């Protein structure tokens, strides 16, 4: 699919053109066309934007699926499934072993081998519930959106945070695309003038809206909440997003706040062998050799049994005789290795077929951190 195709046959709304063309120009876009009156008409498309993602300390090249659409009159014909298979194959050929997306239908994508890997939490805190008596040694300074320290701080955060995407220039453009002009950025600096955390926020109608709040250490976390408290005379409540998958209510003296959680990103391992070659496990774990019987109806190269040797924090495919056997779908395998669910929990849910001893030993080997995914492309 070319830019001309999109301009002439697809995206006719000027606002959509403006918002999506920067992404689509840099994405790998596949489309399905129909011939109507001797003219090609784009009826479906599947776009993948390349990004890097931290998966347990390893920087993976991944594909971010975006701008998936089919005209209503062409749904139900398997077009999107064919485009997805072709697109995932192209990702595999370019050495990308993992993809993620934000689903418009979780059941639909689950049926195609995708599974939930992260959460988004939202919270509402009354002004009287904002933490007080915080006296951190650093200070907070507001900066411009294009401040280099702000962007470098996120890169530092991504390098130490499982699941976080590394933002390139386009990702930053998308991050601020729909924000109001009054949106502000505040950075927390420690006593040595080193940036250690930031928050992106907007104050409107007596409400502080926090788009993102990240920190490299506890000091920065508390320092930013101290900054929030400094606004208590200007606001009635704080509304924010939390991608850490850890409720914040327990942190507050008055924990009676409104907090909601919902699934956010879905992921998919495109190529088991490629993914495992980069994957890290717990170096302090007991190690062991496991066979995984994987079922993948969409991508045939993932169908089969993979024997993986976990040793010293690394994983390798091997011909050794396995000590334990597990069977699962590619979606379950994805959510397990990304840390969203433990093997024991998946066994209880009937998603894994194995002995309890096998899943207990596997859980001792794997890391268990839910991915931090906050970006939308």
Predicted regions and their residues:
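A short, internal acetyl-CoA/4′-phosphopantetheine-binding micro-motif in the GNAT/acyltransferase core
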Residues: 65-75, 207-218
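Short amphipathic alpha-helix that is part of the acyltransferase structural core
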Residues: 1-50, 57-64, 130-170, 204-208
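Amide-forming acyltransferase catalytic core, primarily the GNAT-like/NAT-type
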Residues: 119-211, 218-231, 262-263, 272-286
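Hydrophobic pocket-lining residues that define ligand/cofactor binding sites across diverse proteins
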Residues: 74, 91-92, 228
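Active-site/acyl-donor-binding loops of N-acyltransferases
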Residues: 113-133, 211-377
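Conserved acetyl-CoA pyrophosphate-binding loop and the N-cap/start of the following alpha-helix
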Residues: 74-86, 219-223
């Amino acid at each position: 699919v070319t830019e001309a195709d999109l301009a002439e046959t697809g995206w006719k709304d000027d606002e959509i053109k403006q918002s999506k063309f920067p992404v689509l120009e840099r994405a790998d876009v596949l489309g399905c066309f129909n011939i109507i009156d001797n003219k090609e008409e784009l009826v479906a498309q599947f776009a993948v934007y390349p990004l890097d993602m931290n998966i347990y300390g390893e920087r993976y090249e991944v594909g971010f699926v975006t701008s998936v659409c089919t005209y209503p009159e062409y749904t139900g014909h398997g077009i999107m499934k064919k485009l997805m298979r072709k697109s995932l194959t192209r990702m595999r050929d370019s050495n990308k072993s993992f993809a993620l997306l934000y689903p418009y239908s979780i059941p639909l994508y689950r049926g195609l081998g995708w599974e939930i890997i992260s959460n988004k939490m939202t919270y509402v805190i009354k002004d009287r519930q904002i933490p007080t008596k915080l006296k951190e040694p650093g200070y907070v300074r507001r900066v411009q959106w294009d401040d280099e320290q702000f962007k470098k701080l996120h890169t530092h955060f991504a390098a130490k945070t499982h699941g976080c995407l590394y933002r390139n220039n386009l990702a930053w453009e998308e991050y601020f695309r729909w924000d109001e002009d009054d949106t502000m950025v505040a950075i927390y600096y420690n006593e040595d003038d080193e940036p250690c955390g930031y928050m992106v926020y907007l104050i409107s109608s007596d409400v502080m809206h926090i788009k993102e709040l990240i920190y490299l250490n506890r000091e920065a976390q508390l320092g930013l909440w101290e900054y929030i408290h400094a606004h208590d005379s200007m606001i009635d409540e704080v509304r924010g997003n939390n991608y850490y998958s850890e409720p914040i209510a327990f942190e507050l003296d008055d924990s009676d706040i409104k907090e909601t959680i919902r699934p956010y990103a879905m992921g998919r391992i495109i190529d088991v062998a490629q993914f495992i070659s980069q994957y890290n496990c717990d170096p302090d774990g007991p190690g062991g050799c496991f066979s995984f019987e994987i079922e993948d109806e969409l991508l045939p190269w993932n169908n089969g049994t993979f024997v993986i040797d976990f040793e010293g924090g690394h994983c390798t495919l091997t011909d050794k005789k396995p000590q334990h056997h597990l069977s699962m779908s590619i979606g379950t395998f994805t959510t397990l290795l990304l840390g969203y669910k433990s093997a024991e929990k998946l066994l209880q849910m009937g998603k894994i077929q194995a002995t309890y001893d096998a899943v207990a030993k596997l859980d001792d080997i794997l890391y268990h951190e839910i991915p931090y995914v906050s970006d939308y492309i």
